[in-house]
Amino acid sequence: LKRGKVAELRHTLAAESFAAVEKAKDPAEADDSWPRLRAQQQRALRLPMTGQAVLIDAGEEYDIHPRDKRTPGSRLAAWAFNRVYGRADVPFRGPHPAVVVRDGSSVRIEFADVGRGLRAQGPGETYPRRTKTNDYGKVVRNSPQAEVEGFALAGADGVWHWADKAEIEGNGVRVSAKAVSEPLAIRYGWARNPWVNL
């Protein structure tokens, strides 16, 4: 979703508030067009009165229009109650990075809007590929030793490596990868069909 598209839709619909649904999962392919699109959607949130139902933790691998409509619907409703109708008692978003600091060979990310605190969900055995046909795939973890799944680091060479360690510390997560002694960049859930658990 591009900023220009938001302005166009606001004009067409005569509505100031604008919320969209994040692209969830897509068939696991090698290119990174899907995570780039998610990043573009995130950047559009810098515009005033914009919101998003984050779905990186939901969806189905082989169906970009999954059967679960309750998850995006309830997340969009929470945003509308809080941001449009002024209901401060309704939380409308989950944890998001507030401060990122490199500490030797690790990176610490401090999160805002942590609610009752950060937690990592258990991995489970399977994930939905297409629920219409009762098709489930086996979970394969990229960081089996890490508490939090989905982080990757890169050094000066620009090569990404899945984190060997990603541990919750209070309202933050400390991330490290043995293959990256001096991390310069970090990302989370950067895949077409990521398995994430924070």
Language-model features: locations:
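Active-site proximal loops enriched in glycine and acidic residues that flank catalytic Cys/His/Asp
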Residues: 11-20, 54-56, 111-113, 155, ...
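Solvent-exposed beta-hairpin/edge-strand motifs
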Residues: 133-136, 141-156, 194-195
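Surface beta-strand/loop "capping" patches
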Residues: 83-140
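Short acidic/polar inter-strand loop motif in beta-rich domains
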Residues: 182, 190-198
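Conserved, well-structured interaction surfaces
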Residues: 1-75, 82
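A surface-exposed beta-strand-loop module
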Residues: 167-184
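Solvent-exposed beta-strand/loop surfaces of large extracellular or lumenal domains
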Residues: 148-172
